[in-house]
Amino acid sequence: MTELEIFNLIMIFFIIVGAGIFILLFFVSAPYGQHIRKGWGPNINNKLGWFIMEIPTVVIYLVIYLIGERKTTMMSIIFLIIWMVHYGQRTFIFPFLIRAKQPMPVTIIIFGLTFNGINTYLQARWVYKLSQPYPNDWLLSPFFIIGLFIFISGFIINLHSDRIIRNLRKPGETEYKIPYGGMFRWVSCP
């Protein structure tokens, strides 16, 4: 079996598992944040848990980039920068800004670690080995320009939304609060 065949099987597996989890989450609340409860195994500090969940996104991507055959092309370097900006922030900055005191179940950490590890392999291996090489003129293609615009918009929205959530409670408050403002205007339901 070739690596591309294994890659495609993992993609099919991800689609099937993703659809199953999507349906399951209509009936079961994932046990973190306000929904944390007993029965999901031991808990650890949520900052450490988030860091552990996200670290594969940086390490695996960087390793695949470094062993990849296309690491010196301009597009490969740009993809590396885009990935590292997003996941560097999610791994090394976001967890340490979390104000919530609730612990995180190790089970959730294992699920996140597994997803992030496999997803990072799929993304990096595609870019640096399995796809056709991205030529430098692809930088000016509508696909890249639109994709970069979506990424930058999403990154800014993500940072802003994280800030709103961090500032929901005043020091000493513990009750659940519904976020509002920014994009929460479209997704929150009181």
Language model segments and positions:
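Membrane-anchoring alpha-helices and their flanking helix-loop junctions
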Residues: M1-R185
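Kinked, hydrophobic transmembrane alpha-helices enriched for aromatic residues
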Residues: V187-P190
